[in-house]
């Protein structure tokens, strides 16, 4: 990584032997002080000269910028479906299945890199199908989806982790992945480092959430109080430091595409009408009627028209009492 792209400081041990500051070629502070005190023995203090000479020593320290992500050479053994997301011993059955299927001599040689965003694995050898310059695609396991990691108890060199895969229709599948390392202490160190990275990322995520919630509450208080001034924008330094590796990935398949929201057609029509009135300069009188008609049309359905009512039958004439008496005569 280029030195001007690095931003984190990692303190390294002090230099074992620091060079003395020199005044001129062949002359140093310590030699000048020792010669001066030897010439004037009455000025000698009770402390030894070595202790007095430490005052003039340089206190420089070595600093390493942005420590590189640790990389391990592993053999990927495979994965198996599991029903347990976390807990002691939740990977024993899955690792047993993977070990019985692959064995100690199997697996694919890969480079495992543990970074702030999770685990990244890339094959070491070049793929024959991709040509001489082609490489197999790398596999990334995001930190928020890793639910558990451990060094297996029965196989100390095996490092296993449970990953939450997302299938179609938002279905979740838990799979246990296992890799084989060269030494048992490397597997334990890798598990410990991954847990520390996840804990630090989750702490940063909670801190940023608290900051955003507090800012939202202040904004709501100002709006409720009727204050004209709004909350000032966050400084640039805070915005740059607000990058968190524990941000949960979006649920969409594209991973990063913004969610689509519903379009308010009435508001857009009102805005367009306002713009036309401002451009034309003459208000339209039929605007309320047009809007009411449009609302009524939206409520109408596309079903067929209702069946017409049956035709009215002619009313039969009934004879009155006089006609009945005449008919009886």
Swiss-Prot record:
Matching CDD domains: PTB_FAM43A
Record's compositionally biased regions (Basic and acidic residues): 320-329
Compositional bias per record (Acidic residues), positions renumbered to this chain: 264-279
Disordered: annotated span: 245-329
Domain of life, per lineage: Eukaryota
Bilayer-crossing regions: none
Family label: Belongs to the FAM43 family.
Protein name: Protein FAM43B
Organism this protein belongs to: Homo sapiens
């Amino acid at each position: 990584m280029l030195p001007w792209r690095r931003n984190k400081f990692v303190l390294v041990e002090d230099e074992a032997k620091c060079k003395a500051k020199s005044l001129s070629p062949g002359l140093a502070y310590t030699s000048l002080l020792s010669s001066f005190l030897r010439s004037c023995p009455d000025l000698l203090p009770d402390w030894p000269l070595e202790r007095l000479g430490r005052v003039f020593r340089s206190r420089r320290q070595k600093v390493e910028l942005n420590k590189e992500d640790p990389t391990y050479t592993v053999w990927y053994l495979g994965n198996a479906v599991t029903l347990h997301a976390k807990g002691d011993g939740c990977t024993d059955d899955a690792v047993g299945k993977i070990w019985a299927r692959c064995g100690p001599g199997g697996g694919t040689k890969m480079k495992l890199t543990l970074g702030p965003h999770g685990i990244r694995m890339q094959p070491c050898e070049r793929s024959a199908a991709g040509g001489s310059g082609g490489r197999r695609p790398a596999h990334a396991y995001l930190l928020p989806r890793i639910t558990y990691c451990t060094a297996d108890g029965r196989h100390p060199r095996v490092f296993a982790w449970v990953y939450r895969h997302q299938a179609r229709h938002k279905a979740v599948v838990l799979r246990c992945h296992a890799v084989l390392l060269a030494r048992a202490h490397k597997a334990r160190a890798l598990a410990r480092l991954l847990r520390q990275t996840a804990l630090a990322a989750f702490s940063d995520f909670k801190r940023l959430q608290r900051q955003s919630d507090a800012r939202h509450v202040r904004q709501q208080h100002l709006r409720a109080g009727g204050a004209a001034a709004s909350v000032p924008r966050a400084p640039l330094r805070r915005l740059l430091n607000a990058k968190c590796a524990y941000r949960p990935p979006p649920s969409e398949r594209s991973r990063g595409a913004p969610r689509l929201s519903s379009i308010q057609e009435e508001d857009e029509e009102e805005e367009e009408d306002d713009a036309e009135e401002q451009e034309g300069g003459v208000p339209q009188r039929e605007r309320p009627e047009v809007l009411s008609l449009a609302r009524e049309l939206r409520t109408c359905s596309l079903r067929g028209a209702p069946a017409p009512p049956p035709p009215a039958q002619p009313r039969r004439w009934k004879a009155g009492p006089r006609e009945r008496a005449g008919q009886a005569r």
